[in-house]
Amino acid sequence: MARYLGPKCKLSRREGTDLFLKSRGKSLESKCKLDQPPGQHGQKRPRLSDYAAQLREKQKLRRIYGIMERQFRNYYAEASRRKGSTGENLLTLLESRLDNVVYRMGFASTRAEARQLVSHKAINLNGRTLNIPSYQVQSGDVVEIRDKAKSQGRVKDALQVTEQYGFPSWVDVDVKSMKGIFKSAPERSELGSDINEQLVVELYSK
């Protein structure tokens, strides 16, 4: 399955919520009718069956983190092998991706932009350049923007906006040096309540 390159607003309307596919500070509500599905007949959102609700939740989570279907299944398989709650393990794996950590630290305005920074070798991890977006960052790892990318306007703008909104508690960011420490994976209570990972677990448990 190819990565989706179409309108981001369409995906958010499809899931009925902001998937954070656009820059921070740019509310989708002013331009997207999130309470209406896309398409000519999208005026009313139909009542979903249990299976449809589970499928939609999986698609929503996959799209938030920009994960392809096969890779998402692999994450679920790994989450189910670990001790503890499979759903929370899944969120931990997704949140620990290098591209997501770059986004959480405010070095990019979207996860897609963060993925691009990593792929273009603009990110150092513990002093070494790493271009694998899916790399699992560990507690205490240091993530920083390489010197060649520190002058990029998009990086400066993203940091400025994130600083205004506030950084997540599980990262410690030095804005001036464009460097951050991944203190730990976030607790479930620190993540949004608009994600129902249990529906994803129910879907894959069938």
UniProtKB/Swiss-Prot annotation:
Start and end residues of each S4 RNA-binding domain: 96-161
Keywords: Ribonucleoprotein, Ribosomal protein, RNA-binding, rRNA-binding
Keyword Ribosomal protein: yes
MF GO annotations: rRNA binding; structural constituent of ribosome
GO cellular component: small ribosomal subunit
InterPro entries the record matches: Ribosomal_uS4, Ribosomal_uS4_bac-type, Ribosomal_uS4_CS, Ribosomal_uS4_N, S4_RNA-bd, S4_RNA-bd_sf
Transmembrane segments: none
One of the GO biological process terms: ribosomal small subunit biogenesis
UniProt-listed CDD domains: S4 (cd00165)
Pfam families: Ribosomal_S4, S4
SMART domains xref list: Ribosomal_S4 (SM01390), S4 (SM00363)
HAMAP family: Ribosomal_uS4_B (MF_01306_B)
Family: Belongs to the universal ribosomal protein uS4 family.
Complex and partners: Part of the 30S ribosomal subunit. Contacts protein S5. The interaction surface between S4 and S5 is involved in control of translational fidelity.
Function of the protein: One of the primary rRNA binding proteins, it binds directly to 16S rRNA where it nucleates assembly of the body of the 30S subunit. With S5 and S12 plays an important role in translational accuracy.
Designated name of the protein: Small ribosomal subunit protein uS4
Record organism: Methylococcus capsulatus (strain ATCC 33009 / NCIMB 11132 / Bath)
Phylogenetic placement of the source organism: Bacteria, Pseudomonadati, Pseudomonadota, Gammaproteobacteria, Methylococcales
